[in-house]
UniProtKB/Swiss-Prot annotation:
The keyword Transmembrane helix applies. The chain crosses the membrane at residues 42-62, 84-104, 114-134, 167-187. Belongs to the Casparian strip membrane proteins (CASP) family. GO terms for cellular component: plasma membrane. This is CASP-like protein 2A1. Its main location: membrane. It is a multi-pass membrane protein. It holds the Pfam family CASP_dom. Homodimer and heterodimers. It is found in: Cell membrane. Residues 63-83, 135-166 are extracellular. The lineage of its organism: Eukaryota, Viridiplantae, Streptophyta, Embryophyta, Tracheophyta.
Length: 213
């Protein structure tokens, strides 16, 4: 009889512990949703900011062309500048969609946090790569490359280079915005995971494996 009583008491204790854990988890979710509601307006504005920057950078580059007695040049003649235009267009669309997505209150879930985190990472690296490629083209246009006998071109097409430089500078402003968004989404995602309790390490603490020599 005593053994059965002990088993019943253990079962009741286990149910009580599970109920307490569920209650604690619900409180944690409620606190997280309250914090998200306070941060939502700021994050929405931050997600909308790259939209204007991307459109500005794209517009400046699309209008970038120059012709004189030495010839004519346009952004479409250079693959790096075309990539910059495409990347800014994609990032502008993502900025608009993500701003609307963030502005609408919805329950926070781990799957949604993972989705936003991954998309933020993809578009951050996309716009960073576009800015870096365009910046390298600008460097060659201003300085040339003696090793491959490329002469600088900005002395002849100064207006073209200035407009390209403006577009690249705006693009790197977009990069900074996306880096901040990536930090926010990564914090939101990984703060949902708790560190393992110290009891999981065992009474002896962390054991270091010894390999035979």
């Amino acid at each position: 009889m005593s053994k059965m009583a002990e088993e019943k008491a253990a079962a009741v204790g286990g149910l009580g512990g599970a109920g307490a854990a569920d209650a604690a988890q619900q409180q944690q979710l409620a606190a997280g949703e309250a914090a998200a509601a306070r941060v939502r307006p700021v994050e929405t504005l931050l997600r909308a900011a790259p939209l204007g920057l991307c459109v500005a950078a794209m517009t400046v580059m699309l209008r970038n062309q120059q012709s004189n007695e030495y010839g004519a040049v346009a952004y479409s003649d250079l693959g790096g500048f075309k990539y910059l235009v495409y990347a800014n267009g994609l990032c502008a669309a993502y900025s608009l969609v993500s701003a609307f997505y963030t502005a609408v209150p919805r329950p926070a879930t781990v799957s949604r946090s993972w989705l936003v985190f991954l998309l933020d990472q993809v578009f951050t690296y996309l716009i960073l790569a576009a800015g870096a490629a365009a910046a390298e083209l600008l460097y060659l246009a201003y300085n040339g490359d003696k090793e491959v006998t490329w002469s600088e071109a900005c002395g002849v097409f100064g207006s073209f280079c200035r407009q390209a430089r403006t577009s690249v500078a705006i693009t790197f402003g977009t990069v900074l915005c996306f880096i901040l968004l990536s930090l926010i989404s990564s914090y939101r995602l990984f703060s949902a995971y708790e560190a393992p309790p110290s009891s999981a390490l065992g009474s002896k603490g962390v054991e270091i494996a010894a390999y035979p020599r």
